[in-house]
Protein backbone atom coordinates (compact mmCIF):
# COMPACT_ATOMS: atom_id res chain seq x y z
CA UNK A 1 0.00 0.00 0.00
CA UNK A 2 2.80 2.38 0.93
CA UNK A 3 4.64 1.52 -2.30
CA UNK A 4 1.49 2.14 -4.35
CA UNK A 5 0.89 5.49 -2.67
CA UNK A 6 4.52 6.51 -3.16
CA UNK A 7 4.39 5.54 -6.83
CA UNK A 8 1.20 7.55 -7.32
CA UNK A 9 2.75 10.61 -5.70
CA UNK A 10 5.83 10.32 -7.96
CA UNK A 11 3.62 10.05 -11.05
CA UNK A 12 1.59 13.07 -9.99
CA UNK A 13 4.74 15.09 -9.40
CA UNK A 14 6.13 14.03 -12.80
CA UNK A 15 2.87 14.91 -14.54
CA UNK A 16 2.90 18.31 -12.86
CA UNK A 17 6.44 18.98 -14.09
CA UNK A 18 5.55 17.95 -17.64
CA UNK A 19 2.51 20.24 -17.61
CA UNK A 20 4.65 23.12 -16.36
CA UNK A 21 7.18 22.47 -19.13
CA UNK A 22 4.42 22.42 -21.76
CA UNK A 23 2.98 25.74 -20.59
CA UNK A 24 5.93 28.01 -19.78
CA UNK A 25 5.86 31.76 -19.50
CA UNK A 26 5.80 33.17 -23.10
CA UNK A 27 8.88 35.19 -22.25
CA UNK A 28 10.86 32.01 -21.54
CA UNK A 29 10.29 30.18 -24.82
CA UNK A 30 10.62 30.70 -28.54
CA UNK A 31 10.75 29.05 -31.94
CA UNK A 32 13.25 29.00 -34.80
CA UNK A 33 11.97 28.38 -38.33
CA UNK A 34 14.52 27.29 -40.93
CA UNK A 35 14.10 27.82 -44.67
CA UNK A 36 16.01 26.25 -47.53
CA UNK A 37 15.65 24.95 -51.07
CA UNK A 38 17.35 22.25 -53.13
CA UNK A 39 17.74 23.14 -56.81
CA UNK A 40 18.00 20.88 -59.84
CA UNK A 41 20.75 22.60 -61.83
CA UNK A 42 24.04 22.36 -59.94
CA UNK A 43 27.77 22.67 -60.60
CA UNK A 44 31.03 21.24 -59.26
CA UNK A 45 34.27 22.97 -58.32
CA UNK A 46 36.88 22.11 -60.94
CA UNK A 47 39.35 19.61 -59.51
CA UNK A 48 42.37 21.93 -59.68
CA UNK A 49 40.51 24.61 -57.71
CA UNK A 50 39.32 22.54 -54.75
CA UNK A 51 42.51 23.08 -52.76
CA UNK A 52 44.37 26.01 -54.27
CA UNK A 53 47.04 28.50 -53.20
CA UNK A 54 47.21 32.21 -53.99
CA UNK A 55 50.64 33.80 -53.54
CA UNK A 56 50.81 37.56 -53.04
CA UNK A 57 54.07 39.28 -53.94
CA UNK A 58 56.27 40.50 -51.10
CA UNK A 59 55.49 44.03 -49.91
CA UNK A 60 57.40 46.55 -47.81
CA UNK A 61 55.98 47.14 -44.34
CA UNK A 62 55.93 50.90 -45.01
CA UNK A 63 52.99 50.28 -47.36
CA UNK A 64 51.02 48.88 -44.40
CA UNK A 65 51.93 51.40 -41.72
CA UNK A 66 48.37 52.36 -40.71
CA UNK A 67 45.07 50.57 -40.17
CA UNK A 68 43.09 50.31 -43.38
CA UNK A 69 46.09 50.56 -45.69
CA UNK A 70 46.11 47.92 -48.44
CA UNK A 71 48.69 46.64 -50.88
CA UNK A 72 49.43 44.18 -53.66
CA UNK A 73 46.00 43.35 -55.18
CA UNK A 74 46.31 39.86 -56.64
CA UNK A 75 43.72 38.25 -58.92
CA UNK A 76 42.63 34.64 -58.55
CA UNK A 77 39.93 32.52 -60.15
CA UNK A 78 37.68 29.72 -58.93
CA UNK A 79 36.35 27.68 -61.84
CA UNK A 80 33.15 25.66 -61.75
CA UNK A 81 32.37 22.81 -64.10
CA UNK A 82 29.74 20.20 -64.86
CA UNK A 83 26.82 22.58 -64.50
CA UNK A 84 23.71 20.73 -65.63
CA UNK A 85 20.86 22.51 -67.35
CA UNK A 86 17.36 22.39 -65.92
CA UNK A 87 14.67 22.47 -68.56
CA UNK A 88 11.96 20.90 -66.42
CA UNK A 89 9.63 22.27 -63.80
CA UNK A 90 11.69 21.44 -60.72
CA UNK A 91 13.15 24.34 -58.66
CA UNK A 92 16.17 25.79 -60.40
CA UNK A 93 18.87 28.32 -59.61
CA UNK A 94 19.17 31.50 -61.63
CA UNK A 95 22.72 32.33 -60.56
CA UNK A 96 25.76 30.68 -59.04
CA UNK A 97 28.76 31.85 -57.06
CA UNK A 98 30.60 30.89 -53.89
CA UNK A 99 30.14 31.67 -50.21
CA UNK A 100 33.33 32.54 -48.32
CA UNK A 101 33.37 31.65 -44.62
CA UNK A 102 35.80 30.86 -41.82
CA UNK A 103 34.78 30.04 -38.26
CA UNK A 104 38.36 30.60 -37.06
CA UNK A 105 40.08 33.13 -39.33
CA UNK A 106 37.44 35.79 -40.08
CA UNK A 107 38.30 39.05 -38.28
CA UNK A 108 35.04 40.74 -37.34
CA UNK A 109 36.82 43.78 -35.87
CA UNK A 110 38.63 44.48 -39.14
CA UNK A 111 36.00 44.48 -41.87
CA UNK A 112 35.63 40.69 -41.83
CA UNK A 113 39.06 40.21 -43.41
CA UNK A 114 41.16 37.09 -42.78
CA UNK A 115 43.66 37.06 -39.94
CA UNK A 116 46.91 35.14 -40.10
CA UNK A 117 46.99 31.52 -38.99
CA UNK A 118 50.69 31.79 -38.10
CA UNK A 119 51.96 32.21 -34.55
CA UNK A 120 55.44 32.83 -33.23
CA UNK A 121 58.30 35.09 -34.25
CA UNK A 122 57.84 34.54 -38.01
CA UNK A 123 54.37 36.12 -38.01
CA UNK A 124 53.77 39.52 -39.63
CA UNK A 125 51.83 41.48 -37.01
CA UNK A 126 48.77 43.53 -37.96
CA UNK A 127 48.48 42.09 -41.46
CA UNK A 128 45.30 40.44 -42.75
CA UNK A 129 44.13 39.36 -46.18
CA UNK A 130 41.11 41.03 -47.76
CA UNK A 131 39.05 39.55 -50.61
CA UNK A 132 37.30 41.63 -53.27
CA UNK A 133 34.89 41.01 -56.07
CA UNK A 134 36.33 41.10 -59.59
CA UNK A 135 35.71 44.86 -59.87
CA UNK A 136 38.25 45.55 -57.13
CA UNK A 137 35.93 47.94 -55.29
CA UNK A 138 33.38 45.68 -53.58
CA UNK A 139 34.96 44.00 -50.56
CA UNK A 140 33.74 40.53 -49.59
CA UNK A 141 33.08 40.15 -45.89
CA UNK A 142 34.10 36.64 -44.87
CA UNK A 143 31.29 35.16 -42.78
CA UNK A 144 32.12 34.01 -39.26
CA UNK A 145 30.08 32.21 -36.62
CA UNK A 146 28.76 35.47 -35.14
CA UNK A 147 27.28 36.83 -38.36
CA UNK A 148 23.50 37.21 -38.39
CA UNK A 149 22.88 38.25 -42.00
CA UNK A 150 20.81 35.11 -42.49
CA UNK A 151 18.55 35.70 -39.50
CA UNK A 152 15.35 37.72 -39.19
CA UNK A 153 14.76 38.68 -35.57
CA UNK A 154 11.84 40.33 -33.80
CA UNK A 155 9.84 40.72 -36.99
CA UNK A 156 6.45 39.85 -35.55
CA UNK A 157 4.57 36.91 -36.93
CA UNK A 158 5.94 37.22 -40.46
CA UNK A 159 8.99 35.13 -41.30
CA UNK A 160 11.05 35.55 -44.46
CA UNK A 161 12.72 32.88 -46.57
CA UNK A 162 15.37 35.37 -47.80
CA UNK A 163 18.60 36.32 -46.00
CA UNK A 164 18.95 39.91 -44.85
CA UNK A 165 22.18 40.23 -46.85
CA UNK A 166 23.43 38.45 -49.95
CA UNK A 167 26.60 36.42 -49.39
CA UNK A 168 26.84 34.86 -52.85
CA UNK A 169 30.09 36.27 -54.24
CA UNK A 170 30.60 36.84 -57.99
CA UNK A 171 27.09 35.62 -58.70
CA UNK A 172 26.88 34.63 -62.37
CA UNK A 173 23.70 33.94 -64.31
CA UNK A 174 23.36 30.23 -65.07
CA UNK A 175 21.02 30.38 -68.07
CA UNK A 176 21.29 26.59 -68.46
CA UNK A 177 25.06 26.79 -68.97
CA UNK A 178 26.83 23.44 -69.14
CA UNK A 179 30.44 24.56 -69.67
CA UNK A 180 33.02 25.96 -67.27
CA UNK A 181 32.13 29.08 -65.27
CA UNK A 182 35.05 31.23 -64.08
CA UNK A 183 34.50 33.27 -60.90
CA UNK A 184 37.11 36.02 -60.55
CA UNK A 185 38.29 37.58 -57.28
CA UNK A 186 41.08 39.76 -55.90
CA UNK A 187 43.08 39.26 -52.70
CA UNK A 188 45.26 41.91 -51.07
CA UNK A 189 47.11 42.74 -47.87
CA UNK A 190 45.08 44.69 -45.31
CA UNK A 191 46.73 46.47 -42.38
CA UNK A 192 44.99 46.30 -39.00
CA UNK A 193 47.66 48.58 -37.52
CA UNK A 194 51.36 49.24 -38.08
CA UNK A 195 52.66 46.12 -39.81
CA UNK A 196 55.82 44.29 -38.86
CA UNK A 197 57.94 42.18 -41.17
CA UNK A 198 57.07 38.50 -41.33
CA UNK A 199 54.79 35.95 -42.93
CA UNK A 200 51.00 36.04 -43.05
CA UNK A 201 49.39 32.84 -44.29
CA UNK A 202 45.66 32.36 -43.86
CA UNK A 203 42.84 30.36 -45.43
CA UNK A 204 39.13 30.52 -46.15
CA UNK A 205 36.53 27.89 -47.00
CA UNK A 206 33.97 28.13 -49.76
CA UNK A 207 31.01 26.04 -50.89
CA UNK A 208 29.15 26.73 -54.12
CA UNK A 209 26.09 28.88 -53.48
CA UNK A 210 23.02 29.38 -55.65
CA UNK A 211 20.43 32.07 -55.96
UniProtKB/Swiss-Prot annotation:
Disulfide links within the chain: 43-83
Biological processes per GO annotation: cell adhesion involved in single-species biofilm formation
Gene: hifA
Entry superkingdom: Bacteria
Protein's cellular compartments: Fimbrium
Family, as annotated: Belongs to the fimbrial protein family.
Cellular-component GO terms for this entry: pilus
Keywords: Disulfide bond, Fimbrium, Signal
Family annotation (Pfam families): Fimbrial
InterPro entries: Adhesion_dom_fimbrial, Adhesion_dom_fimbrial_sf, Adhesion_dom_sf, Bact_Fimbrial_Adh_Pro
Role played: Mediates adherence to oropharyngeal epithelial cells. Helps the airway colonization process.
Protein name: Major fimbrial subunit
SUPFAM superfamilies, A to Z: Bacterial adhesins
Originating species: Haemophilus influenzae
Range of residues in the leader sequence: 1-20
Record Gene3D superfamilies: Fimbrial-type adhesion domain (2.60.40.1090)
Key word Nucleotide-binding present: no
Taxonomic lineage from the root: Bacteria, Pseudomonadati, Pseudomonadota, Gammaproteobacteria, Pasteurellales
